[in-house]
UniProtKB/Swiss-Prot annotation:
Statement: the UniProt record of this protein carries the keyword Protein biosynthesis: no
GO cellular component, one term: plasma membrane
Organism of origin: Staphylococcus aureus (strain MRSA252)
Keywords: Cell membrane, Lipoprotein, Membrane, Palmitate, Signal
Phylogenetic placement of the source organism: Bacteria, Bacillati, Bacillota, Bacilli, Bacillales
Top-rank taxon: Bacteria
Protein name: Uncharacterized lipoprotein SAR0438
Length: 260
């Protein structure tokens, strides 16, 4: 009788161990799936890269939800900016924003030049230069006397026009941060300088540090899709004070502005 009780106790303990181990494995799987969810969420837009002709976006539709009014075909918003600290206590930030309205098939936006100071009282000096997209070329609408700046604007290329994320699924062991209350999700990957996108960025921008960047995939909003939230890519080459160097890219689809 005693042997039967001992055997029953042994079986109970064994079952408990199996259940606990299973729960732990389930949690691990759930955590792993969060990384996959982030990559799959980004893949919906990154699979389109490189978008060599931005006007192709007029024929592409993104995620739609109840925020869209009836008949609204939606608007694509693009942003690419490069920020770098060239002097102590300040960061130079330049880039372009473009709105491609699928209803009107017009694309307008602006190129911006900004200095960000540690002394926030100085942070009111952003300059904007209006642009439009015609035949896949940036057309400057404002008069710019600085010939170097004028050429930079007219020859500007968005990151989405030359980046390629065909290997996104192979990025592994990312550092995952989530906040379900906002909600927001972020995956960080340590890259190396042999990465094709990194090499392209080094060819285009004055990146002086030899350190390989960290790639951040950031989502604000429903990870499955939302026209209210946004997705942002960051290549952070340096976050050392007075050496900050970052490339930001943003491609999102949302309801059209009635005035656009």
């Amino acid at each position: 009788m005693g042997n039967i009780k001992s055997f029953a106790l042994y079986i109970s303990i064994l079952l408990l161990i199996v259940v606990v181990a299973g729960c732990g494995k389930s949690d691990k799987t759930k955590e792993d799936s969060k990384e996959e969810q982030i990559k799959k969420s980004f893949a919906k837009t990154l699979d389109m890269y490189p978008i060599k002709n931005l006007e192709d976006l007029y024929d592409k539709e993104g995620y739609r939800d109840g925020e869209f009014k009836k008949g609204d075909k939606g608007t694509w918003t693009l942003l690419t900016s490069f920020s770098k600290s060239n002097k102590p206590d300040e960061i130079d930030d330049e880039g372009m924003v473009l709105y491609l309205n699928r209803n009107t098939k017009k694309a307008t936006g602006y190129y911006f030049v900004n200095k960000i100071y540690d002394d926030i009282s100085k942070n009111q000096n952003e300059k904007k230069y209006r642009v439009e997209l015609k035949n896949n070329k940036i057309v400057l609408l404002d008069n710019v006397e600085d010939e170097k700046l004028k050429q930079k604007i007219e020859n500007f290329k968005f990151f989405s026009q030359y980046a390629d994320f065909k290997d996104l699924k192979n990025y592994q062991d990312g550092s995952i941060t989530t906040n379900e209350n906002i909600p927001s999700y972020e995956a960080e990957y340590k890259l190396n300088n042999s990465d094709e996108n990194v090499k392209k960025l080094r060819d285009i921008y004055p990146i002086t540090t030899k350190k390989a960047p960290i790639l951040k995939l950031h989502i604000d909003g429903d990870i499955k899709g939302s026209s209210v939230g946004y997705k942002k890519i960051e290549y952070k080459f340096s976050k050392v004070k007075d050496q900050e160097t970052t490339l930001r890219d943003y491609l999102n689809f949302g309801p059209s502005d009635e005035d656009s």
